Swiss-Prot record:
Name of the featured protein: U-actitoxin-Avd1g
Keyword Signal: yes
N-terminal signal peptide: 1-21
Principal localisation: secreted
Gene3D superfamilies found in the cross-reference section: Anthopleurin-A (2.20.20.10)
Family: Belongs to the sea anemone sodium channel inhibitory toxin family. Type I subfamily.
One GO molecular-function entry: toxin activity
Propeptide: 22-32
Coiled-coil regions listed in the entry: none
Keywords for the protein's UniProt record, in alphabetical order: Cleavage on pair of basic residues, Disulfide bond, Ion channel impairing toxin, Nematocyst, Neurotoxin, Secreted, Signal, Toxin, Voltage-gated sodium channel impairing toxin
Length: 83
């Protein structure tokens, strides 16, 4: 009986953790959650990374306002550059 109670309490705590992590305003995505903090190679940088700077930044859910898609290479997300 005690084991069932502990399992129930742990599942309840995990559920509350997930529910409390959801944003109240789903349309307002926080910049920290969108930004990966990794550089990427924009199309204007050239074909290879050798001798070229990585001028793009990877954003997970599209480019925010003030940034444009630089048609670069990113494994996940979008390669964006400040406009």
């Amino acid at each position: 009986m005690m084991n069932r109670l502990l399992v129930f309490l742990m599942l309840g705590a995990a559920f509350m953790l997930v529910v409390s992590a959801i944003d109240q305003d789903a349309n307002d995505v926080n910049m920290v959650k969108r930004f990966v903090s990794a550089s990427c190679l924009c199309a204007s940088d050239g074909p290879t990374t050798r001798g070229n700077s990585l001028s793009g930044t990877i954003w997970l859910f599209g480019c925010p306002s003030g940034w444009g898609d630089c048609k670069g290479r990113a494994i996940a997300g979008t390669c964006c550059k400040r406009e």
